[in-house]
């Protein structure tokens, strides 16, 4: 099914779902018109009959149509796709506005600060804090397997390390750098596009901190941030190759 047909089906299903009573083709046509679709009532009638045949809707006498349980399930599926598409477009806009140079500058600053935070965390982390980080990695692994976002897991992982480092100045500096709320989702989007994986990096950082080896922890964090920088470069070469290199 084309994206245009999916969007139209989504709008029709949503219109029927939002109504507390069965709806007819005239009502659906007006709702579609308000959403920018100029479709005749006859065409809407044909679409509704096709939806009956697919099992998404059923007629209630002469009153109109309602959604079947299958139709409700289909609407949920399309709503999920709609949100992902909308969110993806938002992230693309954020990436364009932020720009390659700014993203890399942010990551370079993070490399300097977070490498030291990882080093200090390896020295001062408590058993309870180690357990918390381990739990974050466990949930991140589950989210990766299910194809869900790990942006929140990423923020939590790095914040726990910063807190375990017992250096309030570096912790505050990291908060300042990461105050852009879309930074983690943006980097996650870029990593997916270039087929990069962050979980392995996080596991290596955790192992170094858990073994209380400051040098290994610092190096693991440096490698992690450098991998992110490389992902940004790959993404820009792939998507904006013909644009200004400093975009």
What do the predicted segments below correspond to?
Residues 19, 78, 82, 140, ...:
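A short secondary-structure junction motif
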Residues 7-8, 98, 113, 135, ...:
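Alpha-helix N-cap/N′ positions at the starts of helices
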Residues 178-247:
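C-terminal all-alpha effector/ligand-binding and dimerization domain
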Residues 98, 102-105, 125, 146, ...:
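Non-transmembrane, amphipathic alpha-helical segments
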Residues 1-109:
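Short linear motifs at protein or domain termini
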Residues 12, 140-141, 204-205, 209:
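Generic hydrophobic alpha-helical segments
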Residues 109-110, 116-186, 202, 219-223:
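Conserved amphipathic alpha-helical segments that form helical-bundle/coiled-coil interaction surfaces
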């Amino acid at each position: 099914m084309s994206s245009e047909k999916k969007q139209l089906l989504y709008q029709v299903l949503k219109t029927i779902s939002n109504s507390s009573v069965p709806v007819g083709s005239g009502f659906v046509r007006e709702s579609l018109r308000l959403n920018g679709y100029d479709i005749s009532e006859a065409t809407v009638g044909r679409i509704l009959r096709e939806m009956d045949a697919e099992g998404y809707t059923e007629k209630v006498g002469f009153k109109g149509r309602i959604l079947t349980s299958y139709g409700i399930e289909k609407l949920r599926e399309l709503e999920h796709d709609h949100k992902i598409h909308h969110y993806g477009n938002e992230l693309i806009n954020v990436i364009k506005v932020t720009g390659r140079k700014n993203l890399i500058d942010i990551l370079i600053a993070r490399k300097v600060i977070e490498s030291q935070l990882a080093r200090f965390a390896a020295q001062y982390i408590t058993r309870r804090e180690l357990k918390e980080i381990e739990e974050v990695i466990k949930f991140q692994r589950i989210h990766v397997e299910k194809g869900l976002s790990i942006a929140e897991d990423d923020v939590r992982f790095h914040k726990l390390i910063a807190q375990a480092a017992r250096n309030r100045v570096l912790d505050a500096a990291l908060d300042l750098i990461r105050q852009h709320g879309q930074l983690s989702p943006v980097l996650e989007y870029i990593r997916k596009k270039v087929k990069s994986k962050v979980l392995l990096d996080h596991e290596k950082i955790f192992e170094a901190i858990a073994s209380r080896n400051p040098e290994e922890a610092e190096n693991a964090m440096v490698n992690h941030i450098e991998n992110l920088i490389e992902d940004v470069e790959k993404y820009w070469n792939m998507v904006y190759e013909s644009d200004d290199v400093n975009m």
